[in-house]
């Protein structure tokens, strides 16, 4: 089928699945990982899936183990990542009669899954070989078209544990089935998941590339195999239109993407890009984490074009767009012939806007370099500015939700786009941050996780995944004593003590002691000058490491406001001198 990674959780009812997974791992048919926490295991598998673009599987026993898979299933659903959830169950005769460890688990995950595959009620042994292979193949296709989680609930009757001799007999007579030449397609799978609502897949319309417009690139949610064609289609559209490109760090666009405006989040927050009612808008993928962008897009009114990569659910919380759900490449192939004879003179109406924004962007980036040097006390904006610059270009980055992903949106420079960048922008939770990052590192190689203290502590069981496989993960922990994001969301209107208790929720846990308890190498960095050496040390290790940096969330919140205000004053001063036109 294509399954390469499987995460196995402990259990007795899942014994037949465990023995099968072990046999396949011994013959190098898949990579087997183990995890004692099902919630963590599911996010580890999701990390494999996110990195490779193909589904990984997680196997659990029956009971509450199944409920722990829901957070990862929700994230897979919202972020369009394939994931297989295989749960062992008791036979139907043991349901609703007080039997031990027997619950109605077949319904636990249904709201977040593309498909629920239910095995025979009296036991999976009733499936013929042909039926079982067809069942597995349909599950694989359903997990990828459109991508999301699939739940296979598999009842097993006793006996559950074969002897070693019985296992040898089975393995001797088994060989992996070759997938049929005509795979199940998205069309005959009804394209969207069962129960999907809000489909807005109307016929595409053509924008006018010879009138001013802007491209908004959100997080990439397509399949890995489609990414290069997506990037090339955008290059061709931008070359034709000359439109500026405002890209999210999660957009998977390369650093040499023409028209890239890196400072757009700060410029929008400061009101420096103005309101352009006549601008056309091409939106790619889901909405970014920027509230300034949402407010700005509202000023354009309706008629915007939103293109998604196969997700036919409505992805426009503003309700202002026509949505085309079959991808940018398909849309471009449908329309590009209209402008095949266009020449450079056709761009005369669009080029002034791009040139103006590029000049403003260049001044803004130079000013940020002056304000955020690699020296002195560590601040969160400075970390966002420098971490990407200090890392090898091929190294992937995972950004925890809340503050890190927003800071990198605002303060990271163009070097961020020289690498793949991941985050939870599906359901935007902090659940499973460390575990998913372990999966990314196992699949991709050296990876950096940037996390706040609450996000890391919330998924501290992810440290258990460090052994024995020792994924090359460098964790940069921003320890600011609680939920720093709430300092930015304007909720600090309550008295200080109430704010700390109700929102920030600081925890009395030493992350270095916690790392030591899991045998994780760790160190603390006190100033920005020491950051390069700490990263070099972390990348030199053979497994996960923790680098702790302590920041002050109140001071960093004030600093963000000062940077926004200072940028406005700086650019206005330059404008008064005639160097730029605001």
UniProtKB/Swiss-Prot annotation:
Cofactor(s) named in the record: Mg(2+); Mn(2+); thiamine diphosphate
One Pfam family cited in the UniProt record for this chain: TPP_enzyme_N
Gene3D superfamilies: 3.40.50.970, TPP-binding domain
Biological process per Gene Ontology, one example term: phylloquinone biosynthetic process
InterPro entries assigned: MenaQ_synth_MenD (IPR004433), THDP-binding (IPR029061), Thiamin_PyroP_enz_TPP-bd_dom (IPR012001), TPP_enzyme_TPP-bd (IPR011766)
Oligomer status and interactors: Homodimer.
This protein's name: 2-succinyl-5-enolpyruvyl-6-hydroxy-3-cyclohexene-1-carboxylate synthase
Organism: Prochlorococcus marinus (strain MIT 9303)
Organism lineage: Bacteria, Bacillati, Cyanobacteriota, Cyanophyceae, Synechococcales
């Amino acid at each position: 089928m294509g399954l390469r990674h499987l995460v196995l959780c402990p259990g007795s009812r899942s014994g037949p699945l465990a023995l099968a997974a072990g046999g396949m791992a011994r013959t190098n048919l898949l990579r087997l990982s183990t995890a004692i926490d099902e919630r963590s295991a599911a996010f580890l598998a999701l990390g494999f899936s996110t990195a490779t673009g193909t589904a990984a599987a997680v196997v659990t026993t029956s009971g509450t183990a199944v409920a722990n898979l829901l957070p990862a299933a929700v994230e897979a659903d919202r972020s369009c990542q394939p994931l297989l959830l295989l749960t062992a169950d008791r036979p139907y005769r043991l349901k609703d009669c007080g039997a031990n460890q027997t619950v109605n688990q077949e319904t636990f995950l249904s709201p977040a899954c593309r498909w629920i595959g239910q095995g025979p009620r009296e036991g999976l042994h009733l499936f013929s070989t042909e039926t079982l292979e067809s069942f597995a193949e349909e599950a694989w296709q359903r997990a990828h078209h459109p991508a999301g989680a699939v739940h296979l609930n598999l009842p097993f009757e006793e006996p559950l544990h074969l002897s070693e001799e019985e296992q040898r007999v089975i393995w001797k007579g088994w060989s992996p089935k070759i997938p049929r030449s005509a795979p199940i397609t998205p069309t005959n799978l009804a394209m969207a998941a069962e129960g999907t609502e809000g489909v807005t897949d109307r016929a595409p319309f053509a924008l006018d590339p010879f009138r001013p417009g802007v491209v908004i690139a959100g997080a990439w949610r397509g399949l890995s195999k489609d990414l290069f064609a997506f990037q090339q289609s955008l290059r061709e559209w931008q070359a034709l239109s000359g439109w500026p490109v405002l890209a999210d760090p999660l957009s998977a666009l390369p650093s040499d993407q023409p028209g890239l405006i890196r400072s757009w989040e700060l410029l929008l927050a400061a009101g420096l890009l103005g309101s352009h009612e006549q601008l056309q808008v091409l939106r790619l993928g889901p909405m970014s984490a920027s509230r300034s962008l949402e407010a700005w897009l509202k000023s354009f009114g309706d008629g915007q074009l939103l293109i998604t990569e196969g997700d036919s659910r409505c992805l426009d919380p503003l309700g202002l767009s026509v949505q085309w759900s079959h991808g940018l490449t398909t849309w471009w192939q449908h329309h590009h012939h209209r402008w095949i004879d266009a020449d450079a003179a056709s761009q005369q109406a669009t080029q002034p806007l791009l040139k103006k924004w590029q000049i403003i962007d260049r001044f803004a980036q130079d000013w940020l370099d002056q304000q955020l040097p690699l020296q002195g006390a560590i601040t969160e904006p400075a970390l966002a500015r420098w971490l990407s610059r200090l890392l090898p270009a091929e190294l992937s980055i995972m950004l925890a939700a809340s503050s890190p992903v927003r800071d990198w949106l605002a303060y990271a420079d163009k070097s961020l786009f020289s690498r793949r960048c991941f985050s939870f922008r599906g359901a935007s939770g902090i659940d499973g941050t460390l575990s998913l990052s372990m999966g990314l590192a196992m699949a991709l190689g050296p990876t950096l996780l940037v996390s706040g203290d609450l996000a890391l502590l919330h998924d501290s069981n992810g440290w258990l995944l460090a052994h024995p496989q020792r994924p090359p993960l460098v964790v940069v922990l921003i320890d600011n004593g609680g939920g720093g994001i709430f300092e930015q969301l304007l909720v600090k209107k309550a008295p200080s003590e109430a704010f700390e208790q109700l929102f920030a929720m600081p925890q009395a846990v030493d992350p270095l002691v916690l790392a030591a308890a899991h045998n994780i190498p760790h160190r603390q960095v006190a100033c920005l000058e020491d950051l390069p050496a700490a990263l070099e040390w972390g990348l030199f290790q053979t497994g996960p490491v923790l680098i702790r940096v302590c920041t002050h969330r109140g001071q960093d919140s004030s600093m963000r406001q000062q940077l926004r205000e200072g940028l406005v004053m700086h650019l206005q001063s330059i404008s008064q001198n005639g160097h730029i036109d605001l």
